[in-house]
């Protein structure tokens, strides 16, 4: 049974919540296209980590220098978010001993989502562009929802294909 852990920022732990609901067989917001009875997964941990201190203390790595920090929350440009999401996915997998790690982070631009296994790591960005500094709550929540959908869709494709499609960006 594959185990999964998440280190989430802009998705606020909702990816882990959705995966756990799927694993336990009760409906939630995301409608998986795969049959729950044919897939056996377990969520080891779901972490909400919006701060530099959280990255350092929970994931045990030195994060990239953010563009700025707002009330202890790290704010990156989109390219940095893609790198940080990958590093967060790898770190949460390592720290928890999970088979698969998922990382999400977003500051300025589209949100970044990464999924890592022992030998691969891939990243995608959300469809929604927002700016943590200036966007209204509605826009930020639209990006969050897009991030949860992107992460879960990427996870489904990984399970269905057994590997990542070539169309996903590789950031290592």
UniProtKB/Swiss-Prot annotation:
Tell me the InterPro entries matching this sequence: HcgF (IPR009625)
Family classification:
Belongs to the UPF0254 family.
Q: What is this protein called?
A: UPF0254 protein Mlab_1743
């Amino acid at each position: 049974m594959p185990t999964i852990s998440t280190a989430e920022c802009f998705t606020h732990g909702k990816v882990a919540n959705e995966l756990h609901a799927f694993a336990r067989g009760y409906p939630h917001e995301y409608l998986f296209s795969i049959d729950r009875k044919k897939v056996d997964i377990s969520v080891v941990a779901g972490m909400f980590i919006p701060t530099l201190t959280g990255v350092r203390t929970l994931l045990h790595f030195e994060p990239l220098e953010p563009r700025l920090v707002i009330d202890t929350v790290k704010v990156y440009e989109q390219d940095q978010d893609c790198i940080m999401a990958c590093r967060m996915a790898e770190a949460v997998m390592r720290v928890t001993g999970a088979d698969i790690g998922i990382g999400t982070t977003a500051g300025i631009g589209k949100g970044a989502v990464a999924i890592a296994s022992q030998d691969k790591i891939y990243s995608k960005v959300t469809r929604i562009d927002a700016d943590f500094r200036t966007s209204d709550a509605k826009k930020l929540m639209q990006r969050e929802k897009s991030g949860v959908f992107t992460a879960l869709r990427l996870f489904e494709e990984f399970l269905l294909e057994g590997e990542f499609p070539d169309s996903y960006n590789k950031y290592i």
